[in-house]
Regions:
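Bacterial N-terminal signal peptides
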Residues: 9-18
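N-terminal signal peptide c-region/cleavage motif recognized by signal peptidases
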Residues: 20-22
């Protein structure tokens, strides 16, 4: 009985470690039936003062179609005080950005998807990210 409990405990811990490790690779947020997965180089831990790239890895819409050509997507990067660093049309899945200081930042990705009934449905997701110091 004790051996089985130990086995189940170790198995649960291993599953938890795998889940936590893989969850740290990308951030996923959802709004209005649209899930967006974002990644920031390197490994979602950008370094302040060094140019990096924000990648939109995946856009998945429930009962709707996403296309870069028609989404009217925008990417906005801002610091914790609300000062906007980048606010531009996102016509491709990557946007270059340089986080100036080692602080907390926000990334907002917005756009629209075309529903199966032909109507457009807007979405807007926001992520938190912290830029590390360039030691």
């Amino acid at each position: 009985m004790a051996r089985r409990f130990l086995y189940l405990t170790l198995l649960g811990a291993a599953i938890l470690m795998i889940a936590v490790t893989s969850a740290g690779a990308h951030q996923i947020a959802s709004n209005n039936g649209v899930s967006v997965q974002v990644h920031v180089n390197p490994d979602d831990e950008p370094v302040a003062g060094i140019a990096t790239t924000v990648w939109v890895v995946r856009v998945k819409a429930l009962k709707a179609t996403f296309a870069w050509a028609t989404c009217r997507c925008r990417m906005k990067v801002f610091d914790s005080s609300g000062t906007v660093l980048v606010d531009s049309a996102a016509k491709a899945p990557r946007i270059p950005v340089t986080f100036p200081e080692p602080h907390a930042y926000g990334i907002t990705f917005s756009g629209r998807v075309k529903r199966s009934n032909g109507l457009w449905k807007p979405f807007k997701v926001t992520y938190a990210i912290r830029a590390a110091s360039a030691e």
